Every structure is written in structure tokens, then in C-alpha cells.
């Protein structure tokens, strides 16, 4: 099974991922990220990449609206693009409430705090994550969203993995990585 944690662009990548999802629907999970929100993708280049085709843009956003914001893999690992907003049951996570799950970031500071990313965005600390994991019988969380130097970063004593798979994002010189989950183990590979 392949799980991708959002920000599925440029168009060529998106096209390939949709093809894989059609070919292997039970083995590919595409999660919604902040670039799959209309409020973000119109100004981040998607509309331009579609040659300002309003109909195609609307249809593509309908697909994004149908995408899940989170998934659990191997029965113990919560996957999401951004983060969490507070300890909630998995059944309380909805597509209509996607914002924190595509925007929030982990922080060394405990609790829920304002994020430097902007208005309405928050950070969550180790205490919040541990309570969330315990409430849902989970062991770890894998998320994307944040550029990290080597393509991945472990947080909170190995309870959270930030994974980034795009090289040199925005000219930052960062590395890229992927994770392979088998059973309870996570193998990391730098690209």
C-alpha cells in the first residue's frame, strides 16, 4: 500500500498519482494537503498550470474535496499532511474540518499554540500528540508539510515522523526521503 500525505503537484505528478490510484485503488491512498484546498491552490499556480480553465479547475477541486484528510496504516500509524488540532477521536475528523489537518505543525513547545505560518494555523506539542495517540490506540504519526533538511525528521522520541519527498523545495537545498512501513517498523530512504 502507498500513502501520500498531500501537496500533490505539479500537474505531471498529480496525473501520475491519479493513474496509479485508478490502477490500484485498494493500494494507493492520496491524502489531502494544503495545496489541495481551493484557497491555496488558486494562488499557488494550479489555476495557471491549467491555462486558466475554470471548468477543469472546478472539477479538479471536486476531486480534492473528496480526498480523505487522514488515514491509519498498519493499524497503528496515523498519517496526515499537516498535524492535529487537539486530541480527538478519529471518527471526529471530517473533510469539512480539514484545515488543521493540512496546516498545523509540530512544535517543541507543549500545548496548542499560534503558528508563524499565519492566521488560524497552530502548532501542537508532544503532550497533545501523545494524548491523541493514546485516545485512538495509535503508536505513531507520519506527516508531510514541512521542509526538513534531510527529507525527514523524528520528533517527540520517535512518536512523530515529518517526511518531505521534494528535493530543493523553493531553493532551500533540502534532501528528500520516503518511508516504507512494514509491521511496526519504519524504514527511511533518502532519495
Model-derived regions: residue spans:
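Feature recognizes metal-dependent phosphohydrolase scaffolds
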Residues: 1-191
Amino acid at each position: 500500500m502507498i500513502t501520500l500525505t498531500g501537496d500533490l503537484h505539479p500537474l505531471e505528478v498529480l496525473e501520475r498519482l491519479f493513474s496509479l490510484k485508478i490502477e490500484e485503488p485498494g493500494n494507493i491512498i492520496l491524502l489531502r494537503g494544503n495545496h489541495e484546498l481551493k484557497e491555496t491552490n488558486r494562488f499557488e499556480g494550479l489555476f495557471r498550470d491549467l491555462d486558466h480553465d475554470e471548468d477543469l479547475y472546478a472539477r479538479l477541486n471536486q476531486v480534492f474535496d473528496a480526498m480523505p484528510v487522514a488515514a491509519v496504516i498498519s493499524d497503528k500509524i496515523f498519517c496526515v499532511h499537516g498535524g492535529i488540532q487537539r486530541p480527538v477521536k478519529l471518527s471526529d475528523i471530517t473533510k469539512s474540518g480539514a484545515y488543521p489537518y493540512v496546516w498545523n505543525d509540530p512544535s517543541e513547545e507543549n500545548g496548542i499554540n499560534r503558528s508563524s505560518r499565519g492566521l488560524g494555523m497552530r502548532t501542537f506539542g508532544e503532550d497533545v500528540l501523545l494524548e491523541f495517540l493514546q485516545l485512538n490506540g495509535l503508536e505513531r504519526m507520519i506527516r508531510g508539510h514541512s521542509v526538513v533538511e534531510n527529507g525527514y525528521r523524528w520528533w517527540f522520541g520517535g512518536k512523530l515522523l515529518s517526511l518531505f519527498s521534494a528535493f530543493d523545495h523553493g531553493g532551500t537545498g533540502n534532501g528528500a526521503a520516503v518511508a516504507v512501513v512494514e509491521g511496526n517498523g519504519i524504514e527511511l530512504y533518502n532519495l
